């Protein structure tokens, strides 16, 4: 306990606030890393006892602490394939210039990093979605995977914003090997017991925009953590077999798609997200009209997220409880 208290005191005013909000501190240890693509890296870690304390739920995320100019800063990342029994999980990073990416690029076995758990939770929409409309980009890829894993048989349309060259290459050259995505097929294990369930999360550092939807002010990492592989609290542990299939526009990223249920629509990023907004507005009205209980999930840059959240609430009349919107990064 003393060690955790000292850790929290070393995190500056942000750490002090999280401590007041009953945040729990842990130290993770790196066990390995792999370069998924040139700009996307996966780091494997042990949890420092975290999962035994917190349990696991879909889209679960943690706050990692990085030092910049002698001051601590926290960034949030979604857990990938958390295993409470083994005390392990992975994190995925969309690499760019910044202290979090610098750490991920050089992370090696034995390295440690401090983390705080506060604010993460998951509440399955009620009634259950008849169709999910998910809108994201590489920063929110882990959370998209997590959502798909939690509701594997729900029809889902995914608008995925990518760097321009990824979509252009796919459109002109077909599904080249470097653009294939690793897709996981989830199958229930009847012998697996239920995982610890925990009651999408409105975070302490999230503010509501003019549409009444939660939009994080800054810095959800890189992706904010992928929840690909998190356990479904109702179904227990799931096995996942990676099946590489052509996914034009994915840029080689590890999307966990099921062609029987998921409609993947890559959109090249142009005009600071304007092209994505235009495409979603063109597609969404018909999709919403076709389904009785839609659920909209948005996790793009803050400006795009605010614009789309306002569109669904004000222009399409979507009830607030049928939408989850978080800005993951600032352009």
Spans of model-derived segments:
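Short basic-hydrophobic amphipathic alpha-helical segments used for membrane targeting/insertion
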Residues: 175, 188-193
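Extended, composition-driven regions rather than compact fold-specific motifs
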Residues: 2-174, 183-186, 200-202, 206-210, ...
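Hydrophobic alpha-helical membrane-insertion segments
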Residues: 188, 231-233
């Amino acid at each position: 306990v003393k060690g955790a208290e000292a850790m929290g005191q070393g995190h500056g005013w942000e750490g002090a606030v999280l401590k007041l909000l009953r945040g729990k501190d842990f130290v993770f240890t790196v066990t390995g890393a792999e370069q998924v693509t040139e700009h996307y890296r996966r780091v494997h870690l042990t949890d420092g006892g975290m999962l035994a304390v917190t349990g696991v739920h879909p889209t679960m995320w943690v706050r990692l602490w990085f030092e910049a100019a002698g001051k601590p800063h926290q960034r949030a990342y979604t857990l990938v394939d958390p295993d409470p029994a083994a005390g392990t999980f992975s994190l995925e990073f969309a690499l760019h210039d910044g202290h979090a990416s610098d750490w991920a690029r050089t992370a090696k076995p034995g390295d440690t990093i401090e983390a705080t758990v506060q604010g993460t939770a998951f509440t399955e929409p009620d009634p259950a979605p008849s169709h999910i409309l998910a809108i994201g980009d590489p920063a929110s890829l882990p959370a998209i995977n997590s959502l798909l894993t939690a509701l594997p048989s729900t029809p889902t349309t995914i608008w995925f914003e990518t760097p321009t060259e990824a979509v252009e290459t796919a459109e002109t050259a077909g599904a080249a090997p470097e653009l294939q995505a690793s897709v996981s097929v989830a199958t229930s294990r009847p012998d697996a017991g239920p995982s610890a369930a925990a009651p999408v999360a409105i975070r302490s550092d999230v503010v509501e925009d003019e549409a009444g939807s939660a939009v994080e002010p800054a810095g959800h990492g890189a992706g904010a953590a992928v929840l690909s592989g998190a356990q479904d609290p109702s179904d227990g542990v799931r096995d996942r077999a990676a099946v590489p299939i052509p996914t034009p526009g994915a840029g080689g990223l590890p999307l966990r798609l099921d062609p029987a249920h998921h409609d993947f629509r890559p959109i090249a990023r142009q005009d600071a997200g304007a092209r994505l907004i235009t495409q979603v507005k063109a597609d969404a009205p018909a999709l919403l009209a076709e389904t009785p209980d839609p659920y909209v999930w948005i996790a793009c840059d803050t400006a795009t997220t605010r614009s789309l959240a306002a569109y669904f609430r004000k222009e399409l009349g979507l009830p607030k409880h049928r939408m989850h919107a978080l800005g993951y990064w600032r352009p």
